[in-house]
């Protein structure tokens, strides 16, 4: 485990896996992942920032695709971004607060859908020749997925994927945009990736 400044990294199955503090739109990787909505229409938070930074061709490309199911992923060029591609994945909504049995079942399904977001994004990246990819904290904003649970699902999903697909990537990053998310992700990263 290497720790320097605002990132922590390790090696797993021939891949550098890291948690970094920064802005997803500034990452110099083959693919950045966008926490999109089903209509791929842009929005607020990370989705809005990516649409703004990628420029006016991105909305047109998203309209041509039209729709993305929750738990699935689609790809567009990166346009004005440093990344060659943007993978748009739609994370699940989370039933927050006091929930009944139906709410508990919804949240169990939400965890499966969130794991699918990571798996489908990684598969799509490989299919398009990508060797480096950066993920935001999918579903933790407007979709109200608790950050600790979402981060654990993200890291477990990536770990499982790499164990099943050794050396599929050179680097996988989890990009955290504020101090609280970074501290949380750092702790969960150490829990999941410590030898």
Describe each PLM feature range.
Residues 1-127:
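Glycine-/small-residue-enriched capping loops at alpha/beta junctions
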Residues 94-195:
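Phosphate/ribose-phosphate-bearing ligand recognition and processing surfaces
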């Amino acid at each position: 485990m290497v720790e320097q400044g605002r990132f922590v990294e390790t090696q797993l199955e021939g891949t550098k896996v890291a948690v970094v503090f920064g802005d997803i739109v500034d990452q110099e990787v083959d693919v950045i992942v966008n926490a999109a909505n089903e209509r791929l229409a842009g929005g607020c938070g990370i989705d809005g920032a990516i649409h703004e930074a990628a420029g006016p061709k991105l909305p047109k490309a998203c309209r041509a695709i039209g729709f993305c199911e929750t738990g699935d992923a689609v790809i567009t060029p990166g346009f004005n971004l440093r990344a060659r591609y943007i993978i748009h994945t739609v994370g699940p909504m989370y039933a927050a607060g006091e929930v009944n049995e139906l709410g508990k079942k919804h949240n169990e399904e939400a965890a499966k859908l969130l794991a699918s977001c990571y798996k489908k994004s990684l598969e799509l990246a490989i299919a398009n020749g990508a060797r480096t990819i950066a993920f935001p904290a999918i579903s933790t904003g407007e979709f109200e997925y608790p950050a600790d649970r979402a981060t654990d699902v993200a890291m477990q999903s990536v770990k499982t994927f790499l164990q099943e697909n050794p050396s599929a990537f050179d680097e996988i990053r989890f990009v955290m945009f504020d101090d609280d998310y970074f501290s949380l992700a750092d702790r969960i990263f150490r829990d999941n990736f410590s030898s």
